Amino acid sequence: MTIRTERVGNAIRKEVASMLTRGEIKDPRLGGFVNIQEVRVSPDLSYAKVYYTVFGESDQAGVADAWQRASGFLRNVIAKRLKLRHAPELRFELDHVADYSKRIDELLNGLEIPPADDSDETH
C-alpha cells in the first residue's frame, strides 16, 4: 500500500466507525455488535474493501445485506466529509480473523502438555 491509499483507508475506517457509533446508519442490523477492523483501498482509489466483525449471535447475512444497502449512502457521506472528488466504491467483507483466533485459543487450551520434569536437567 502506498502512503496515500493507507491514509485514505484509515480515514474511511474512522469515518464509518464513527457513523456507526453516532447512529447515523439507520439500519438496526448494524447497531451495537459490528466493528470496523480495516479498510484496504485499491491503488487507483476506485475501490475500498471494508473488513468488519460481528459480535454475538447477530444475523451475519442480515448484516451483510445492511452494509450492501447502506454502501451508496456511505460513499456519498465519505466523499463529502473527506473532501474526495471521487470516493471509492465500498465493498464490505466479514473479517474472520476473530473466529480464527478463537479457534486457535481453543486448540491451544485443549492440548494436554505434561508438566516439565526437573530431574532431567543437567547442571
UniProtKB/Swiss-Prot annotation:
<dbReference type="InterPro" id="IPR015946">
    <property type="entry name" value="KH_dom-like_a/b"/>
</dbReference>
<dbReference type="InterPro" id="IPR020053">
    <property type="entry name" value="Ribosome-bd_factorA_CS"/>
</dbReference>
<comment type="subunit">
    <text>Monomer. Binds 30S ribosomal subunits, but not 50S ribosomal subunits or 70S ribosomes.</text>
</comment>
<keyword id="KW-0690">Ribosome biogenesis</keyword>
<protein>
    <recommendedName>
        <fullName>Ribosome-binding factor A</fullName>
    </recommendedName>
</protein>
<dbReference type="GO" id="GO:0030490">
    <property type="term" value="P:maturation of SSU-rRNA"/>
</dbReference>
<comment type="function">
    <text>One of several proteins that assist in the late maturation steps of the functional core of the 30S ribosomal subunit. Associates with free 30S ribosomal subunits (but not with 30S subunits that are part of 70S ribosomes or polysomes). Required for efficient processing of 16S rRNA. May interact with the 5'-terminal helix region of 16S rRNA.</text>
</comment>
<dbReference type="InterPro" id="IPR023799">
    <property type="entry name" value="RbfA_dom_sf"/>
</dbReference>
<keyword id="KW-0963">Cytoplasm</keyword>
<dbReference type="InterPro" id="IPR000238">
    <property type="entry name" value="RbfA"/>
</dbReference>
<comment type="similarity">
    <text>Belongs to the RbfA family.</text>
</comment>
<dbReference type="Pfam" id="PF02033">
    <property type="entry name" value="RBFA"/>
</dbReference>
<dbReference type="GO" id="GO:0043024">
    <property type="term" value="F:ribosomal small subunit binding"/>
</dbReference>
<dbReference type="GO" id="GO:0005829">
    <property type="term" value="C:cytosol"/>
</dbReference>
